[in-house]
A protein has these predicted regions:
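Hydrophobic ligand-binding cavity/cleft-lining segments
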Residues: 6, 10-121, 219-224
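Beta-strand/loop substructures that line and gate deep hydrophobic ligand-binding cavities in soluble
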Residues: 43, 150-210, 214-218
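Intrinsic-disorder/low-complexity, polar/charged segments enriched in Ser/Thr/Lys/Arg/Asp/Glu/Gln
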Residues: 59-65, 140, 165-167, 179-181
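Hydrophobic/aromatic beta-strand elements that line small-molecule binding cavities or substrate pockets
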Residues: 62-64, 130-132, 166-174
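Short strand-connecting beta-turns/loops that link adjacent beta-strands
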Residues: 69, 137-138, 175-178
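Hydrophobic pocket/interface hotspot
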Residues: 73-76, 132, 182-184, 216
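Short, hydrophobic/aromatic-rich segments at coil-to-beta transitions
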Residues: 113-117, 135-143
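A mature extracytoplasmic/lumenal domain signature
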Residues: 136, 145-147, 186-188
Length: 224
């Protein structure tokens, strides 16, 4: 228990230092971190769910190579979310924000049967959340932002104020050599009143999202 707590604390300190650095250097690093790990072909590639936010004001395409088949990676994606398998990122930082996250290092059978319409939370009730828009096991998962109050998927078109429309997509591209490219993409549209907020959130999302990809790789390769 003590060892686990120290590990979480150490990772959180590293994550916090990275957050500070990326926030300060965001204007210079923005193009790099929004394409972290992805090839030009992957950035340009059309993915399921792209049509849900047709004119994104912000977004990214990131990718990582995992040395195992898609079947070994999918279970970790299927159980993603608060109150499920976690978000595989800096747990200590997430919980400082009140997200009540507990990341698992096990495959949880009770969360493997993911269905369209399922709710995926990033924190407790009232925090950002998503609905499963489409799911193709061992291949593709598309989430669409839901209203934190009603937990219903939002409209495709942004409203004037206090509104964000977003998709979050995971795509597994299995290669002939037995490795798999895990591609993650987010497309975001928002009202003008939220522009500054999202510009501040963007570099934070990179640090947390990068850690998520690295952790999923570690977990999947460990079980391969």
């Amino acid at each position: 228990m003590a060892g686990s707590m120290l590990k979480t604390l150490g990772e959180s300190v590293v994550g916090a230092l990275q957050l500070v650095g990326v926030l300060v250097l965001s204007p210079v690093l923005r193009s790099w971190y929004n394409r972290w790990g992805a090839t030009a072909e992957e950035v340009a590639r059309s993915l399921p769910g792209d049509d849900l936010v047709t004119a994104p004001l912000m977004g990214y395409t990131r990718a990582i190579t995992i040395r195992t088949r898609a079947a070994a990676i999918w279970p970790w994606l299927a159980q993603i979310g608060q109150g499920r398998g976690g978000l595989y990122s800096y747990e200590g930082l997430e919980n400082l924000a009140g997200c009540r996250i507990r990341n698992t290092d096990r495959i949880l059978p009770e969360f493997q049967d993911l269905k369209v319409g399922d709710l995926i939370r990033l924190g407790p009730q009232g925090y950002p959340c998503f609905r499963v828009w489409s799911v193709e096991p061992e291949r593709s998962l598309t989430l669409v932002a839901a209203d934190p109050k009603t937990e219903q998927a939002v409209d495709r078109m942004p409203k004037p104020k206090g509104f964000s429309a977003a998709t979050w997509h995971f795509f597994l591209d299995e290669r002939a050599d037995g490795t798999t490219r895990l591609i993650t993409r987010q497309r975001l549209a928002y009202g003008r009143d939220m522009a500054l907020l999202w510009r501040l959130v963007e570099p934070v999302d990179f640090i947390m999202g990068r850690k998520m990809l690295l952790t999923i790789r570690q977990l999947a390769e460990r079980r391969a």
